[in-house]
Amino acid sequence: MLSTMQTVGAVLMLSIVLVAGRKRHHCDSKYYELTPAHTMCLTDKPNAVAVPLTQETEHEILEMHNKIRADVTDAANMLKMEWDERLATVAQKWAMQCILGHDSGRRGEPDLPGSVGQNVAWSSGDLTFLGAVQMWADEIVDFQYGVWTDGTGHYIQQVFAGASRIGCGQSACGNNKYFVCNYYKGTMGDEPYQLGRPCSQCRSSCQHIRGSQGRWGSLCDCTNGPDACFNGGIFNINTCQCECSGIWGGADCQEKHCPNEDFDDMCRYPDALRRPQHWCQYDNFQSDCPILCGYCPNPN
């Protein structure tokens, strides 16, 4: 029989284990399931103070980005950006880490498939958020389309044609200020847009707006379209709709439309002639053989 002291010790040890377990899961499970190292699972620095953005500042940051994008006179597919609170929440969390650097790709958003980009700035002076946005944009002086140049990554992210959503956050850490913007989608390429006349790939959704220098520019306005396309769907910037494939349908390609038999004949042959089932890891095979791969029930 355990003594009272042993019992208390056992309970204490159990409590420590349980608390430790909870600590590892202190963030929302949707982020933890992406990666336990997700930005939303980090602990804020003790000296970090959140500096909430006003709606006016959010609007100014968004408007400034769209003006910068409208300044690009040879982009055929430049999307208009809109504000996204999901991205802003993660950006704010990273700002609370007080680090002049990026969060190593741990900023993904479960509701937005694909990569999320990020721009970060730091100042111990009187730099404002709009000043940080302009500082990133000033990298254009070293930008050359199709040629990667160090020191232009912030500008490239600002004018990545496929970046349709932005969310930002800021913090104060002692005498230092940190500014963070997250973008969906992100890019690291040296060709951030397709060359051509502005809006030439989106004539049905084209909107003319004034750029940062007061000149008129054009952006593909799909802000009323779906947030993203899932399950391999392709976003059509002319119609502002997802083009789904295989068994997937609906506005964002998340509705499953199961067939009575697999689309690919090879998936319906006797077992000995079937394609190897481990091929189901590939997206095109999942679309061709949804029953064989277990995405749809076998009606037989």
Swiss-Prot record:
The keyword rRNA processing does not apply. InterPro entries: CAP_dom, CAP_sf, CRISP-related. Contains 11 disulfide bonds. Its main location: secreted. GO terms for cellular component: extracellular region. Residues 1-21 form the signal peptide. Residues 62-183 form the SCP domain. The keyword Hydrolase applies. It is found in: Secreted. Pfam families: CAP (PF00188). Keywords: Cleavage on pair of basic residues, Disulfide bond, Hydrolase, Protease, Secreted, Signal. One of its GO terms (biological process) is proteolysis. Expressed by the venom duct. Its EC number is 3.4.-.-. One of its GO terms (molecular function) is peptidase activity. Residues 22-24 form a propeptide. Belongs to the CRISP family. Protease responsible for cleaving the conotoxins from their propeptide precursors. The target propeptide requires minimum four residues including a leucine N-terminal of the cleavage site for efficient substrate processing (example: Xaa-Xaa-Xaa-Leu-Asn-Lys-Arg-toxin). This is Cysteine-rich venom protein. It comes from Conus textile. The lineage of its organism: Eukaryota, Metazoa, Spiralia, Lophotrochozoa, Mollusca.
